[in-house]
């Protein structure tokens, strides 16, 4: 659910924030297509990654990349900052799903389909929770800008937490070297 929360808050509200930060800019309608371009690039790149190692490191990296995209947009609410943030947010989007599904196949080969449904539902819970959370932040802060900033900080924090959980899992439950990933 952390990836769903991090993605939906950013993808939904970053264009709104950009409109407030860059009023009248002719590039405002380009942020969604840039995110889509990042998704396409990420989808192509993720299929080129060898699936022989511990995918939890790749999942952590994807979470960190999305958190970085949010941080850049917060640190630099400028045209270059929003361009970078939009494009980079999209890059790990499909890779997260692809790597997570491969990890499910490794952990639960006999019941992978059920677990894939479960993680999809959990991702959806994060997506559902995001917009109401933003609404609460907007009501509880002094300005709309402060509410959006806090919401994006929470989204980035959720992604960093998700990455740290994956890294913690690699230490707590290392892959068994006698049964390495087979490259499925």
Spans of features found by a protein language model:
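Intracellular juxtamembrane helix-capping segments at the cytosolic ends
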Residues: 95-108
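Multi-pass alpha-helical transporter architecture, strongest
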Residues: 153-184
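Structural signature of the two symmetry-related core transmembrane helices
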Residues: 57-72
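Helix-to-loop junctions at the C-terminal end of transmembrane segments
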Residues: 42-55, 138
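A late C-terminal transmembrane helix in Major Facilitator Superfamily
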Residues: 110-143
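Helical-face signature of the major facilitator-like transporter fold
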Residues: 4, 70, 78-90
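Extracytoplasmic gate region of multi-pass secondary transporters
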Residues: 1-33
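A membrane-interface helix-boundary motif in multi-pass transporters
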Residues: 136-159
């Amino acid at each position: 659910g952390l990836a769903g929360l991090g993605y939906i808050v950013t993808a939904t509200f970053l264009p709104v924030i950009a409109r407030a930060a860059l009023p009248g800019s002719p590039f405002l309608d380009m942020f969604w297509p840039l995110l889509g371009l990042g998704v396409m690039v990420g989808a192509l790149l993720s299929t080129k990654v060898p699936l022989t190692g511990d995918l939890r490191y790749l999942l952590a990296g994807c979470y960190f990349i999305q958190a970085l995209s949010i941080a850049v947009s917060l640190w630099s609410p400028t045209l270059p900052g929003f361009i970078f943030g939009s494009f980079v947010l999209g890059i790990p989007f499909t890779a997260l799903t692809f790597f997570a599904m491969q990890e499910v196949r490794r952990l639960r080969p006999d019941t992978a389909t059920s677990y894939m449904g479960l993680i999809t539902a959990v991702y959806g819970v994060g997506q559902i929770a995001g917009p109401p959370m933003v609404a609460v932040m907007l009501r509880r802060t002094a300005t709309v800008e402060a509410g959006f900033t806090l919401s994006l900080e929470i989204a980035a924090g959720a992604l960093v937490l998700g990455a740290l959980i994956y890294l913690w899992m690699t230490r707590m439950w290392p892959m068994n070297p006698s049964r390495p990933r087979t490259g499925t």
